[in-house]
Amino acid sequence: MKITIGIPAYNEEKNIAKIIVQLKKVADQILVCDDGSTDSTSEIAESLGAIVIK
């Protein structure tokens, strides 16, 4: 069984890294739905291995 977790995000560059790091301990795949962020949320999420949907 594989676990996928989806995270909605908007301008969460200050929080997204620690959330993804913690979720990677229990999830096989992390999807971040970026709702038009104007900061580095998407780039940070991608650098940590999350799949980003814009």
Describe every region a protein language model picked out.
Residues 1-54:
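Structured catalytic core of nucleotide-sugar glycosyltransferases
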